[in-house]
Structures are given as C-alpha cells and as structure tokens.
Amino acid sequence: MSTEIAVPAVERAFPTWGGPAERLRFLLHYAVLAPSRHNTQPWSFEVEGDEVRVYADPSRALPAADPDGRELVMACGAALQNLRLAASHYGFATSMEVLPGHRRDGLLARARLEERRATTPEAEELFQAIPRRRTNRLPLDGREPPEGLIASLVREARREGAWLRPVEEHQRRAVAELIAEGDRMQWASPRFRSEVAAWTRPNATSRRDGIPGYSHGMSDAASYLHPLLLRFHDPGRVEADRDSRRAIGTKALLVLSTPRDGKGEWLASGEAMQRILLRATAAGLSASYFGQVTGVREVRDRLRQAIGESGEPQVMLRLGYGLEVRPTPRRLVDEVLRRFEERSPRARTLAVRPAAVRATPRCGAPEPSPALAAP
C-alpha cells in the first residue's frame, strides 16, 4: 500500500486500444495519489463513456478540523489536477465543467477526454512528479530554494485562478504566532483530538487510508499508543511550540489565496496547490502544510491582515529540503469508483432510438433493445 507507482509498468498497462471509459479508469490511478487532510482521500468518481464525474465523499469529512468542507473540496481539486496531467501525458486534452453551488449528491466537477494532443515539457515534468510527491511532516533544513523556483510556483497558482504569496521575513514572527494560536485552539477541543486519533494508524496498518505513525517519525510502539493518548491529553502547547519554530526556520513559507471563498474557488485552489507541490517535488524539495492557520476562521482572518492579503487564504505551505519519507497508503481505484459505464449517455441514447421503431416479434413480447439488454 503506497503512493508509489512503478511508472514504467503502469505506462505499459495504459489501454491504448481501449475505449474512453477504460482510459479514464486507468487515469484514476494517478488521481488517487493526491494529498488530503489526515489522508482521508475524500473523493469518489463515476466514469461514463468519455466523461468522469468527481464527487466529494461526505463519509470522509472532518467536521472538527474542516467544518465547512473546504479542505475536502481542495483535496478533490488536487485529485482532478492529477487526472488532467495524466491525460495530457497519455496524449489527451481534457475539458472541465465545475458544478456551481452546493449539491446534495456531492458532485463537484465533470471532466471529459477530448481530442488527442501532444503534452508540453512543463506538464510532463509535473506528471512525472505525481508518484514521487510526499507530504513531509518531519523537520526541513534551512537551505534556500533554487533561484527562480518561487516565481515558477506563483505562475502555477495563476494558471488556476489563484495567487501565491511568500511570507516576508518581517512578517514571519507574527505568522508563527498565529500558527501557534491555531494549534492551541484546535488541540484544546476533545472533538478535534478524537478526530485526529480516528485517522491515525499504527505503522503496521493494513488500512488504505489515514496517517501511519511513521509519517511523524514514530516508532512501532509509539504508533500504537499515540492515538490512545490523544483522546485524553491535549498536546496543544507542544505542537504550538514546534510549529512556530518550524515556521520561523522555514525559508519558503507560502500562502495560497483566491479572490473569493466558495466551492469553485476551493476546487481551483486544490488544483493550484497540487501544481505547486508537483513543481516543488520536481525541483527536489519537500513540502507540508500549516493547516491550523487556515482551519480556524478567526485565525484565518488575522492571517489575511498579517500578510496584507486582500483575498481568501486557502492553505499555507512550507517548502524545504528534508529526508526522504515513506509514502502513505492509498485506496484502490475500485474502492473509489462508484460507477463505470463503457458508453456515454449520448451514445446510449443513440443506440436506443432505433429500437423504438423495430417490429414486435411474432410471439407478442417486445424485443429488448441491445443497449438495454447488455450486462
């Protein structure tokens, strides 16, 4: 169970001679490698012909850490970006429709495979980084990122209608204090601690979701004890001290924002975030998040003021160089694929129409349409 893909083997498995639905199903192997809070993997998909529909999975929501479902939608946006990059790698363009407002069925977007199109070197570099991207929750060193990288990350954000703002040196201490305050506020909640514990896994887990203890540098024994301790002990002060020190010592501290704050913006910021993470991975950097500073509404508002941001901060990233970390588990494509149809709705409609004018068999029973009789 790994986010690692044996890319050459997978590429040989691409259904070159298959139909659009088979190709989309294959591309979902890359979509599911996207990051998500607590590795909840809160997405599901329907494939119908040349169209894939992306759904938010409410059963994997985090009501304590993410009461509005903002980070859940962002995770789905990151998965969608992976799928689009994979389609480009295999020579297909994609068109996308974002569904407005709040839908009871959780449908967020539709993407469709379009005509064949050659990929670009920039998109190819991002695609190749998909199986190598990790969330590095361990300490990062204080080396500066490569020259020109931050400007490149800013451009990636703009491609998706978001913007990326580096935290300036003179703003660093105030931002670190906000991170610490967010830590203390979140960890003080028994509900929040129980939620974290529920998604924390022992190192030897057979589960395909959640965060194994090794992601935090825990021993096997500690990985079993940690979720039990969280339910009874508030680690807020320790977490606040650690995270504020990491924020001050991180050379690249970045805030991703959008002009407004709705589901469309959350989805776009998830796509932008994934492009940023992949570009950083391609440059040899590690990344992780300070979710507490955007996860608490009042702290998020104060962050906007502290950095002079006119938009809505969606996520804070820290980038740097660190030790290579093990991947977290991932669910199988069959676990997140809720429906699979070879033909599109349009193709089925065309197939059914001739049946309406066919003669009734002599036995008196109507002959079934081939389209409807298919298994």
Locate predicted features.
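Acidic, surface-exposed loops and disordered segments
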Residues: M1-P375
